[in-house]
A protein has these predicted regions:
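Feature captures the catalytic cores and cofactor-binding loops of soluble hydro-lyases/lyases
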Residues: 22-23, 27-46, 50-119, 127
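An N-cap/entry alpha-helix motif that binds or orients negatively charged groups
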Residues: 1, 5-29
Length: 128
């Protein structure tokens, strides 16, 4: 799914276009905890969050996400938007809830960043 399709599906406003282009979004994940993002985040993913802090932009850049979507009408600080511009990280603002945004993307075929049980790429074997 392309970022323009995400923007349309979420009825989002573009706070930062990331320098232009229309990147491919591989998958999506939703969390209000930066620690979760650092554990399961993947390059090329779309991050949906209501946590409108500078730390989210830093973590998103570290993971190399395709874009960040701030949900529930949350407005990130000017510092966060400025950092996103410097890092060429697209930032979208959606008026919809985290749940609603996730559903809108799911029905359009965008997979989640964490596979469902039984669909994992690798299986962890017990050493016990």
């Amino acid at each position: 799914m392309r970022l323009t399709e995400v923007t349309e599906a979420l009825e989002a406003e573009v706070a930062c276009d990331g320098g232009g282009g229309n990147p491919e979004v591989a998958c999506a994940g939703a969390s209000d905890m930066v620690s979760d993002l650092l554990v399961w985040g993947k390059p090329g993913m779309l991050l949906l969050t209501g946590l409108a802090h500078l730390s989210v932009v830093r973590a998103a850049h570290l993971i190399d996400v395709a874009a960040v979507v701030f949900v529930r009408g949350r407005i990130p600080s000017e510092d966060a938007v400025e950092l996103a511009r410097e890092l060429a990280l697209p930032v979208l603002l959606s008026p919809h809830s985290l749940y609603d945004c996730s559903g809108r993307l799911y029905v359009r075929g965008l997979p989640g960043v964490i596979p469902a049980r039984g669909e994992a790429e690798t299986t962890v074997k017990s050493t016990a």
